[in-house]
């Protein structure tokens, strides 16, 4: 049946096309957006997620349209993690979160929250300050010098920003010390910055007094940082036109700290004679275990309440706890223990840095139970809470990490109050050239889905991405995108197809949450995550790859076959172009090209044509 229909040509966006200038990719031009292949009659709860770089989503229209067009759910890569929203003093800034949630939900996307409780990317400066020993209130305050520098004799500074670019210079005087000549008012205070002191030995969590003898040609503020390149405290140091000894208190976050000064927003001269750090010599009293617990419940309450208020009820599902299970240890029942700051040779990726292990202080059960209680207290009434972890498809230990996680969920829920709704499996995996390795990982992916289904919990593939490994070495290096062959790209596409279909085959409809493709595009060579690997469904220029077709086949259960074999009418006039129902003109222009298109309805010569 054909019906007359007028169509306005609309150019396809680049993310709707395969790589230009290569006939191996032309078939990808004809596919619809990924989400159009979801069969909601069979899988009404399924959500197709895309890992999202939030700053890119908010600033790059091509990237934003790619996410909005292809996915039904968006997951922030980092923007909703604690360290992205909370500074070293516990101040919370959710402005980016609010803008992201509003933009995505107005585009019709479901926003999945990632993550409420974790040990990595935490505001550890703030948390460590909260747990710091308290000075003995019965003792008299007494300070002792820790470090000092007199610029009248020590005429040097450490690393500094470019003087010519930012319009400043430094000189030294035997009477006035360091003189900073600022001739340009810059956009940012940190445009002019320099290390005044380095390698200051401090005790983390302890408060120190800094005294600076300083003046300026006009009154102003020096901006400061005591810490390292990742963490620190940032008080301002006010000065006038007269010499003054200015005192500022700092709480040490980093044991071996530098002292940085910034004055990019000041025009004039700043004079600094000397700087001195002093520490309180009074005996400190550590918090009791009960005080530490209550302090962290306060911090967790403030964090979760703030995030839930920022999301305004729009984010209805969360990774409650991320990466809790260690890949080692014994919990006394033959399962792996929880991750902690010490004791696991292979279970912890990132001790130090911004890591803070809540369970070290709160206990393995209380940590998760408190997070769950607060999420349900402040979140929407219908909130769903997941435990998310990696290596749940582990073939080297027969899925022991997943079995351990399922056992830990039973422990957390044993109080009769805590309820975990679902399990998220990250699936940062590889496709293997070696058949033995490939079959082994596929066997344990199948077993993973079976175990998750048996748990009765909602099942979500939360961060799926894939590399490619050649040779027989199970732990061999992944092939870089630039070195991949067409056959290897297509083998990865087949692997994606198989995983998606295996999810639908093994996870009951009522337990399906969905699958999130963590890396939508290939990883740049300088990325800290699988740098230079072919992990995306689009390349770095936003063109579709063969893996896109693998996802389509997986979602669609293979190509539809109901009208397979029906031949095109040879009289069909394709000279005026072939269009999709949304009015976008396809690159196909011949009858043979129409024959090669995916099955569906198209507009040809002003009529609807079933192919």
Model-identified regions with their sequence ranges:
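Extracellular beta-strand ligand-recognition surfaces/modules
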Residues: 226, 245-276, 312
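Beta-strand acidic-aromatic groove motif in beta-rich domains, primarily in extracellular
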Residues: 189-195, 218-230, 257-262
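N-terminal substrate-binding region of glycoside hydrolase catalytic domains
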Residues: 14-99, 103-143, 147-152, 158-160, ...
């Amino acid at each position: 049946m054909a019906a007359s229909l007028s169509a306005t040509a609309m150019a396809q966006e680049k993310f709707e096309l395969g790589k230009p200038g290569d006939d191996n990719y032309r078939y990808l031009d004809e596919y619809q957006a990924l989400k159009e292949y979801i069969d909601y009659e069979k899988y009404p709860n399924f959500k197709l997620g895309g890992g999202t770089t939030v700053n890119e989503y908010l600033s790059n229209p091509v990237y934003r349209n790619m996410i909005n067009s292809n996915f039904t759910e968006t997951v922030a890569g980092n923007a909703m993690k604690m360290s992205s929203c909370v500074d070293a003093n516990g101040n919370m800034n959710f402005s980016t979160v609010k803008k992201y949630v509003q933009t995505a939900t107005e585009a019709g996307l479901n926003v999945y929250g990632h993550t409420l409780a974790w040990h990595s990317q935490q505001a550890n400066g703030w948390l460590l300050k909260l747990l710091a020993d308290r000075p003995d209130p019965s003792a008299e305050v007494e300070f002792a010098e820790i470090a000092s520098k007199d610029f009248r004799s020590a005429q040097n500074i450490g690393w500094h920003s470019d003087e010519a670019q930012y319009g400043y210079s430094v000189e030294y005087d035997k009477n006035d010390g360091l003189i900073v000549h600022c001739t340009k008012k810059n956009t940012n205070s940190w445009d002019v910055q320099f290390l005044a002191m380095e390698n200051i030995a401090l005790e983390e969590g302890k408060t120190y007094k800094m005294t600076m003898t300083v003046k300026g040609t006009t009154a102003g503020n020096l901006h400061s940082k005591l810490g390292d390149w990742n963490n620190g405290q940032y008080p301002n140091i006010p000065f006038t036109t007269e010499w003054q000894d200015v005192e500022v208190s700092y709480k040490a976050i980093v044991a071996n700290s530098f002292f940085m000064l910034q004055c990019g927003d000041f025009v004039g001269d700043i004079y600094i004679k000397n700087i001195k750090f002093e520490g309180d010599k009074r005996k400190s009293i550590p918090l009791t275990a009960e005080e530490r617990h209550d302090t962290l419940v306060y911090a967790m309450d403030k964090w979760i309440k703030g995030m839930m208020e920022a999301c305004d009820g729009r984010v209805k599902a969360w990774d409650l706890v991320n990466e809790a299970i260690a890949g080692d240890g014994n919990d006394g029942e033959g399962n792996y223990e929880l991750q902690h700051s010490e004791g696991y040779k292979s279970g912890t990726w990132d001790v130090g840095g911004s890591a803070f292990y809540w369970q070290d202080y709160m206990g393995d059960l209380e940590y998760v139970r408190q997070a769950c209680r607060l999420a349900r207290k402040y979140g929407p009434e219908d909130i769903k809470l997941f435990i998310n972890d990696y290596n749940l498809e582990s073939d080297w230990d027969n899925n022991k990490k997943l079995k351990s996680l399922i056992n830990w969920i039973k422990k957390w829920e044993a109080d009769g109050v805590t309820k975990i709704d679902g399990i998220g499996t990250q699936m940062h995996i590889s496709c293997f050239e070696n058949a033995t390795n490939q079959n082994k990982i596929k066997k344990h992916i199948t077993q993973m889905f079976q175990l998750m289904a048996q748990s009765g919990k909602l099942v979500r593939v939360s961060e799926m991405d894939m590399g490619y490994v050649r040779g027989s070495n199970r732990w061999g290096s992944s092939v870089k995108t630039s070195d991949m062959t067409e056959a290897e790209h297509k083998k990865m596409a087949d692997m994606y197809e198989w995983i998606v279909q295996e999810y639908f085959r093994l996870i009951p409809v009522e337990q399906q949450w969905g699958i999130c493709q963590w890396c939508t595009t290939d990883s740049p060579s300088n990325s800290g995550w699988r740098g230079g690997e072919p992990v995306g469904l689009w390349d770095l220029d936003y063109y579709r790859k063969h893996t896109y077709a693998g996802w389509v086949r997986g979602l669609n259960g293979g190509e539809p076959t109901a009208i397979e074999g029906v031949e095109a009418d040879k009289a069909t006039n394709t000279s005026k172009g072939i269009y999709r129902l949304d009015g976008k003109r396809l690159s196909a222009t011949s009858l043979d090209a129409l024959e090669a298109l995916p099955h569906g309805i198209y507009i040809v010569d002003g009529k609807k044509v079933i192919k």
